[in-house]
């Protein structure tokens, strides 16, 4: 899995379905089609039918598209999606982390119209509506367009809490957002100390990313990216390139290049 094998013909364009529950998926080289909460029916990818309130179907998935131009659907749940690769699983050098132009969806790829709060919010019986304060966490994703490490925090000040750190907007919500952090790889952030020589070797391409429902964090990184926050309160950072960014419905934080929100 490196630059020398990227075009050697020893990899395939894969279709991968994680099914229900919490999955860890790697596309590796090739132009892959990955669905964190999907299933295969006679070799074809299908979507698990679920409402945003159905916790038995959507899992909190970890997905790396790896090399190639991949299409990734996180599905329901708080998913961590990297269009390229991390350094957490033996891909320790930049040469081992080639990346292409990816299309990444935090959900199932459903169209989220203007002033729409995302997926249908009903219970399993189809009767009651999930409150607005529950919608923020149910499908809150972190998505990196290119290479990077996504961490879920388990403690502060060197103390392991024994479980994932979470937070909630008020005391009446039962769904809690998992606290996460991102480490950008093979990427040179802008700023007063920007190093153009280092940026010349950055790895990545122009990606299209849709957060869909939930409070999403999206970082386009290298290339001219197209970013959609869609429903709820999202943070979107375009990174290097001529990016097109739409926050969508909700109170969003948007940076065209690099910085902190």
PLM feature segments, named:
Residues 1-261:
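Acidic, glycine-rich low-complexity segments
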